[in-house]
Amino acid sequence: MSPSPDDIRGRRILIAEDEAMIALDLESVLQDLGCEIIGPVADVADLVQQFEAHHPDGALLDINLRGKQVFAVLPRLIQQGVPVIITSGYDDVTLIPQDFRELPRISKPFNQTALRELCVTVFAKR
């Protein structure tokens, strides 16, 4: 049976996005799914701080936050079993280090239906 939105209701999802309008869209989609939002954060230092303080059930991360990439933080999330979805305005997969190319990702601007489906699929796994 495929996961349903009920499977992620109450999950604490960390949002890292430095573009305010996109962050609001991400937050809206996740709230509609019944998730609790951590953030959104707009830089890597805040991402690390919020991750350590709240131990999220999932993370939706822009790969580039105010000119700094999030790739150094990803191993910590993955090691602790936190499901991650990468968001990016870049379609070129070669911009993502090889170790992280298999992570679920969605391109910006995103389709809200596709984002909802991806969030349910990925965040229901934990």
Question: Model segments located where?
Answer:
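Conserved acidic carboxylate
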Residues: 17
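Active-site residues of response regulator receiver
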Residues: 62
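Alpha4 helix (beta4-alpha4-beta5 surface) of REC/receiver domains from two-component response regulators
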Residues: 72, 79, 90-108, 113, ...
